[in-house]
Amino acid sequence: MKKCFPKLLPAQESLLLSSHQIDSITKQRYYKFFSEHIDGFKICENDSDMIPYVSSAVTWLISKTRDCTKFPLIAEENTNFGFTYNLLGLKAYGITVSCIGIFFNLALMFLFFYNFICVDLKILIASLVINLLFLLLWIFIVTKSLVISAGKKYARALLSACDSNSLN
């Protein structure tokens, strides 16, 4: 997580006073909710003093929203977040496997054109295109920004549970 979120997770960061990811009215409503449900939760004047409180609040909220039947959107966004994070962790392997596939396809094409093997050229071209597309996907789509975006969506879904009747 430190690779994409070096300081705080998106839900924690969203609750800081300096953050503009959530409008101030909604943030005040969340603060009120946490004050009513978590003993010792308080709002501090600066972000550094607020960090332990928002971290505790998010941890508490995660533990209260684990039921997938009551909170399906949170479960879905958490799954998406975890999936994108795992993809980023596998990026080097994905690029390596795609490059090996491209090299293998080019070698087969070389052998085909020099009549060492008899293979349908359409299949070779199709598999080369597929490997190239996967290589492009690994390079340009699976990025830190994809994980950060998924993390922010999860944070939004998680914090919106404060407005749910299921927690009151």
Role assignments for model-derived ranges:
Residues 98-104, 124-144:
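Alpha-helical membrane-embedded segments
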Residues 41-122:
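Membrane-proximal, non-transmembrane alpha-helical segments
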Residues 11, 57, 75, 92, ...:
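A sequence-composition feature that detects small, non-aromatic residues
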Residues 1-75:
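Charge-rich cytosolic interhelical loops and cytosolic tails of multi-pass membrane proteins
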